[in-house]
Amino acid sequence: MSKSFRDLNSDLFDSEDSKFLDPKFARKKAMDFLALREYGQKELINKLRSKGFSDEISSSVVERLTEDGLQNDSRFIESFIRSRIKQGKGQLKITQELEQKNLPSQLIFSALENLAKLY
């Protein structure tokens, strides 16, 4: 029986797989994502999952980032609303897009109300 490429290089694959079990690596990846733009909590969890991190690690890392003030749903919502207003989208469309991201309705309406005063 011939050995597969993965069997012959198991130490390479094991070290590659193990980094996805490391919460510190997950935190670094999450911070890399947040350095580019704001993310909603659930969106960031899903982004980490899509990169290969477990549900548990993804959720705990994002929860800690939220506690540390590095991730904030209100900040994400305000940033999202501003970008959509610049694109010429109306309040109803913006609200629908935010609701599709499973963000708290109270935060959405509060941010829309605050930004409506500015525009």
PLM regions and their residue ranges:
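An alpha-helical, amphipathic repeat domain used for nucleic-acid recognition
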Residues: M1-Y119
